[in-house]
Amino acid sequence: MDAIDWLAEMSRRLEKRIPDREARFEFLRSVHYEATRAGLDPQLVRGLIQVESGFKKYAVSTAGARGFMQVMPFWIKVVGLSDDNLFHLRTNLRYGCTILRHYLDIERGDLFRALGRYNGSLGQAEYPNIVRMAWQNQWSYSKSKLALR
């Protein structure tokens, strides 16, 4: 029952950003799968996505980063296959989660520094703090918090 409650609550929170119910559920399942696969908290990954792309699948930054997790195309040569599409949901999430895990490993679990590396702003507090706030304020989940609503 916990998984059903979690999915319903996360779906409710995402409804304005991803209006299509099926697309929203696929997004949530995919984030959960890829984050868990990389040893990350799915709620953290949703916070990062909120900050990076605003949940826009086809977002492209001025630097050329692509998709939900704003993955730079050079990563395809480093960890992927030449025909990988960074706008594909699972591909983008797999890359983004793998990259964040890589940076967490380099930084020996220091999330602040790993987020700085992910964003290319290592040593600056703004980006890691914004992601943490999105994670904690928008995407944290506990049954006790739901009971208070």
Residue ranges and their predicted role:
Residues 1-149:
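Catalytic glycan-binding domains that act on GlcNAc-containing polysaccharides
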